[in-house]
UniProtKB/Swiss-Prot annotation:
Compartments, as annotated in UniProt: Cell membrane
Main subcellular location: membrane
InterPro entries (alphabetical): UPF0756_TM (IPR007382)
GO cellular component, one term: plasma membrane
Keywords from the UniProt entry: Cell membrane, Membrane, Transmembrane, Transmembrane helix
Name this polypeptide is given: UPF0756 membrane protein BBR47_23170
Length: 153
């Protein structure tokens, strides 16, 4: 086995130990592509994979609107209550941070390993819930920006 395969197997094991089926499945799919000489698809997956993942995530979030489980009556309190306005602000801040996380992952793709291991530590020792690398990367980008800002003073 070469280093790429070894890294993917390690990520599969980390995903299984950390109860992160998405990491384990993603690494497994990439390992199968690599072992079946379908590596030619890697550049396309690398270039469009995040966009496709975000598309499916957005579709899943919008399903309650399409299935009419959420109506206008459910939406109006968002703009008239403290809880609703706080939820709107939280969603806006979270998506902004996710965008910063995406920028960080695009410029520093090797950071995914640290984010995955950190997520596993959070799951195992703090009973956290894995929500994906974007939020972890967003928080990391925010902390790095704070470090840069305070470090330059």
């Amino acid at each position: 086995m070469m280093s790429g395969e070894v890294m993917l197997v390690i990520l599969i094991v980390i995903g299984l130990i950390g109860r992160s089926p998405i990491i384990a499945t993603a690494a497994s799919i990439l390992l199968v592509l690599k072992l079946t000489a379908l590596e030619r698809f890697f550049p396309t997956v690398e270039r469009r994979g995040l966009e496709l993942g975000l598309l499916f995530l957005t579709i899943s979030v919008l399903v309650p609107f399409a299935s009419e489980k959420i109506s206008w009556k459910d939406v109006t309190p968002l703009f008239t209550t403290v809880v609703g306005l706080t939820a709107l602000a939280g969603g806006a801040i979270a998506t902004w941070m996710n965008g910063k996380g995406l920028d960080l992952l695009r410029s520093e793709p090797h950071m995914i390993v640290g984010l995955v291991i950190g997520s596993i530590i959070g799951i195992v020792f703090f009973r956290g819930i894995p929500v994906g690398p974007l939020m972890a990367a967003g928080i990391t980008a925010f902390v790095l920006k704070l470090w840069e800002w305070f470090g330059s003073r």
